[in-house]
């Protein structure tokens, strides 16, 4: 690899090492060259030393740890105070979410959109979701469910819903065929 590619990377690491040494010595970091004079004062990210220590990597800075041992921060017995909210386990994994209820306005608008076109493009789904205050996923699932409902309603005439209705339909058809046969025989 040519030095053209390596030199910028090497200088970046030297600058980072110098900054780390300055922090370790308790010196403030120099302002970066891109710092704007008109920018507002920067806020501290961490309010306490304890919070700042949470983001440190003890396995990198302690060389005295035994090689076979697992670092302390990898143990599962860490206190909940050291876990960020997004790291905590969610509700019971087997529990389902509650049923989504839509307002009358949302349902009306979704129905109108469905009558116009039962399939949405991604762009239109985004527009509808923003207009109705729903997520894209909710709109997508509503349209999937509505298409299935439409399919069931339209297939009800073609295919009976249960075996009992099917038997009744066959009996009616046979009766109707017999009546047709009788009518044909009387006309001949």
From Swiss-Prot:
It comes from the Eukaryota. GO terms for molecular function: DNA-binding transcription factor activity, RNA polymerase II-specific; RNA polymerase II transcription regulatory region sequence-specific DNA binding. Residues 152-176 have a biased composition (Basic and acidic residues). GO terms for biological process: regulation of transcription by RNA polymerase II. Keywords: Developmental protein, DNA-binding, Homeobox, Nucleus, Transcription, Transcription regulation. Residues 152-188 are annotated as: Disordered. PANTHER family: HOMEOBOX DOMAIN-CONTAINING PROTEIN, HOMEOBOX PROTEIN HOX-D8. This is Homeobox protein Hox-D8. The lineage of its organism: Eukaryota, Metazoa, Chordata, Craniata, Vertebrata.
